[in-house]
Amino acid sequence: MTVSRNLAAFAALNGALAVLIGAFAAHGAGPQIKTLLTTGGHYQMVHAVLALVCAIWPGRGRLVLWAGWLSATGGLVFCLALSAVALLRLTAMGAIAPIGGGLMIAAWLLLLIAALRSQSTPA
């Protein structure tokens, strides 16, 4: 099995950041800040795991690799935008969150296309 080392490393970094943000949210954040950080951290963690799966996907093609990069990047952009709103009160950064969301949606759609194009193999 081949592994995309760079994608796996980026996914791992995203996972670590998601845990850090979740820990910060759990310890000492007010209710509104906690909600924003928890939401961002959740999406970042889910998409870090998806990116890691894409990095180690057996027989992965370009669509799966692209899905991994879009997933990790989208999760990071979404989470950082919500964190900037919550922690720095940069409300204008809230406008960037949908870009991250769009990247995450694109990642899932690329995986859908990859799955539909794949050949079935007997178990």
What are the residue ranges of the model-derived segments?
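Polytopic transmembrane helical bundles with strong interfacial aromatic enrichment
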Residues: 1-123
